[in-house]
Amino acid sequence: MGKYESVKEKRLYLIAMIGAIVCFIGDNLLGAFTPASDFGNKLLCVNFSYEWADSNPYRFVVAGICGVVSLLMMFAGFYGIYMRLKEKNNRNSKIFLCSSFVFVSVGTLYHNVFAVTAYTYNRLRADGIANAKEISLDVFNTFILVGALAAVGYACMVIIMFISTIRGELFKNRWMCMVNPFIFMVICIVLSKVLPQTAFVNGVFNLGQQSIGLFIVFCFFYFTCNR
């Protein structure tokens, strides 16, 4: 890889790293950081918080914007990984690119479903609507199955990254197959369970698990551009 291509690739990962930070901020704005009492579907998402009713509704608007902007920025990093796979004539490079596009495009919907649900619940409670929770959950359940396609794209990406690293197509050292966003997500999940249940632990390791995992991975790619 030439010097110009290396600098260009590093810029892509730098943009993606910033995007992961913005995503972390959006997740924590949306997640209330300290859900004292909550409700919702634990299998699909972090719980909704009753504290949303007492929050500034524009917080959820900002959270939704952060989610959309951050995913678009992180696509730059995914494109950089695609270019590295393409350079090695990886037969799965186009599948990776398509998967990352699905993850980003549908992921923006996923973020907005959460934001709209939180905003709806907040405004209905402010207007004294008795069944605000049920209405909000109806909104969530109507759209979240479409947003779940983001998980399919994400799964395809992490599998391709893992296999390609073992083949020596992403990093020189095959042990770096452990540099995988899914693995870092699992570590964050474990930490969120074993550490004391505080607002900080919940915000960082529960709500921010995916953005932290992607941030670490983009950092590794950033510092290995001159491989």
PLM features: residue spans?
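Hydrophobic, aromatic-enriched alpha-helical segments typical of multi-pass transmembrane helices
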Residues: M1-R227
